[in-house]
A protein has these predicted regions:
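Cys/His-rich metal-coordination motifs, chiefly Zn-binding "fingers/knuckles"
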Residues: 1-52
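Acidic/polar residues in short coil/turn loops that connect beta-strands
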Residues: 24, 71, 109, 147, ...
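Beta-strand-rich domains and repeat architectures in extracellular enzymes and scaffolds
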Residues: 51-68
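Residue-level recognition of a conserved intra-blade site in WD40 beta-propeller repeats
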Residues: 60, 68, 95-98, 106, ...
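Short glycine/serine- and acidic-residue-enriched loop/turn motifs that recur at repeat junctions
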Residues: 63-64, 68, 75-89, 101, ...
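Conserved core positions of repeat-based scaffolds
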Residues: 64-67, 76, 102-105, 114, ...
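Thr-biased low-complexity repeat/linker tracts and other Thr-enriched repetitive architectures
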Residues: 70-73, 91, 107-113, 129-133, ...
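Repeated scaffold domains used in trafficking and secretory/extracellular systems
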Residues: 93, 131-132, 167-168, 205-206, ...
Length: 317
């Protein structure tokens, strides 16, 4: 977000601007001269904005589906063996993400909420602030801060992203993490067992998607790039794309005309999206696919063994 020096509100969207301490990351009064937390002088401190409230959004885990409404409330359906669906008290949510069996959300004040399996500390987000987005891998969580830096927690997560800067989006796969850079390139960290981290040649990227065994980048021209490794048949031939999501074994994308294409494992019907229209974005679970339509309706197809596709009554705005 480009701001005039000393601006208190964004000229474009009206979001209130505050200051962030360059030493400890604390968010401060916009007129503060010293950090209230660590005492560092704040002359030249970078202005940051809170995450802008969205109309709504969706996320898909292994056996559960989550969405947030325009009023900041959260909807959830599916398996709750680890408490991943215990979101009843959540409010002011502006973003959600699902891991295998846990759920994470960003609140309007830039903090995070988490519930579900915490075996590897993937839900230990109590100290996270200044967030604008989150992403979940199978057993780790990644948070994007308003200054373009990235936080991570969970199995083998913290050392992966600590030096990243100028990041505008993040996504997480089974054992790797992707970051979209401001200049349209991408970075990756993690095991890269199947070549999932081979993104150094990517350019002109507008969105990223991390799966179990593959990584995809959506280019400005509406086509996809892949990292080395597994890729679903025909995906690189798709055109006119505006959004992409990947599950462990299937890939889903939205086209400019609001229709949806899918490829990969079809055993549970997760790729039966040919009749969908007016779709804005998609999410891919392990064996199911979810879509958010432009009118606020939510669609789902695939494995419904835990009720993860029971979204017919959902309306996000």
């Amino acid at each position: 977000m480009d701001l005039r020096p000393g601006a208190r509100f964004c000229d474009r969207c009206g979001t209130k601007v505050e200051k962030i301490c360059p030493a400890c990351g604390a968010v401060l009064r916009d007129q503060a001269r010293f950090c209230d937390l660590c005492g560092v002088p704040l002359e030249g401190a970078a202005p940051v904005s809170r995450p802008k409230a969205q109309k709504g959004g969706i996320a898909a885990g292994q056996l559960h589906t989550v969405a947030f409404r325009a009023d900041g409330k959260v909807l959830v359906t599916g398996n709750n063996d680890f408490g991943q669906c215990d979101v009843g008290g959540w409010s002011d949510v502006v973003g959600v993400a699902c891991g295998k069996d846990f759920t994470v959300a960003v609140r309007a004040d830039g903090t995070a909420l988490a519930t579900g399996n915490n075996q590897f500390g993937q839900c230990d987000l109590s100290g996270w602030t200044n967030l604008i987005a989150v992403a979940c891998g199978e057993t780790h969580t990644v948070g994007l801060r308003s200054d373009g830096t990235v936080l991570a927690t969970g199995r083998d997560a913290k050392a992966q992203v600590g030096k990243w800067e100028n990041i505008t989006a993040v996504d997480a796969g089974m054992d790797h993490t992707l970051g979209l850079c401001k200049d349209g390139t991408a970075v990756a960290a993690g095991q890269g067992m199947f070549g999932t981290c081979a993104v150094e040649h990517w350019q002109d990227i507008t969105a990223i998607a991390a799966g179990h065994m593959h990584s995809l980048g959506l280019r400005k021209d509406g086509r996809l790039l892949q990292a080395d490794g597994f890729i679903a048949p025909g995906v690189l031939d798709w055109t006119d794309l505006t959004a992409v999501a990947v599950g462990p074994y299937h890939t889903v994308a939205v086209k400019q005309d609001g229709t949806v294409v899918a490829s990969g494992d079809i055993q549970h019907g997760q790729c039966q999206v040919e009749t969908w229209t007016n779709v804005r974005t998609v999410a891919a679970g392990e064996r199911h696919t979810v879509a958010l339509c432009a009118d606020g309706r939510v669609l789902a197809v695939g494995d419904d063994s835990a009720g993860q596709c029971d979204v017919t009554e959902w309306k996000l705005w």
